[in-house]
Amino acid sequence: MLPNIQRTLAMTARAACVTIVAFFSTPGHAAEVHVLSAAAMQSVFKDIRDEFQRTTGYRLVPHYGTIGAVNEWTMGGEEADLIISSSQSMPSLVYRGKIQAGSQTAICQTSIGVVVAAGIELNLNSVEELRRALLAAKAIVYADPARGGAAGIHVARVIEQLGLTEQLRPKLRLAAGGDITEVTLSLGPTALGITQISEIADKPLAQLAGPLPEELQNYTVFVAGVPADAPQSEGATALLKFLRSPKAIAVIRAKGMEDFGSDGGSE
């Protein structure tokens, strides 16, 4: 009887191993890579998610917010495997021990543009043309600067720089966490929104009227870093590598962002 019991136990053990392997090999149970990211990267992650998951076996789980929110989450100890914030913010996160020194990678750069309903034409080639467009608009939408978004903070400065703060105040609409483009469209064809150009992409009922004039432009460089206590640092490394691949770079460029080159990764 003993040999039979041993054989039975061995078969049971082998079956259990097969079950465990199958469990963790299925897409529903793939290791997850949690990302805290600036919202400007949302359209990029939306388009690369399937390919990243297919080629690496990791499941991408992004969470979006303003740069200020991402920094607050990181400082507060929110668990994540990768943080994507601005180049201005990352050194402080490293200094405070929240991001591993040497893990930072510049991903892309974006600028600020004006969004309007599809079919609306605006000339924004000069500061004066932007001034006229702002004065003519029935509503102007941008991110609430108090929430820490780079675009919202800069737009408020631009309006002040143009000397239009009081004149425009009645028609300013601060979007508290909402999609700037969607809020703009909801206010009708005479409204315009000002936000990161990457956040205007993939909106069929909207169009980019143009970037801010160069004299008033602001560029944000997005940098990724691995948290000091990242649960899935290998997955974070895989995502960083994928973000520098030709496929990811093609998506980044399609969103109106400037990449920082390929590392020759997977095609």
Task: Give the label of every model feature segment.
Residues 1-11:
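N-terminal secretory signal peptides that target proteins for export/translocation
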Residues 2-3, 69, 79:
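Intrinsically disordered, low-complexity peptide-like regions
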Residues 2-3, 18-20, 121-124:
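Short N-terminal or domain-adjacent regulatory/targeting segments
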Residues 10-24:
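Bacterial N-terminal signal peptides
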Residues 30-76, 87-88, 92-96, 100, ...:
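Exported/periplasmic ABC-transporter solute-binding proteins
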Residues 81-85:
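Periplasmic-binding protein-like
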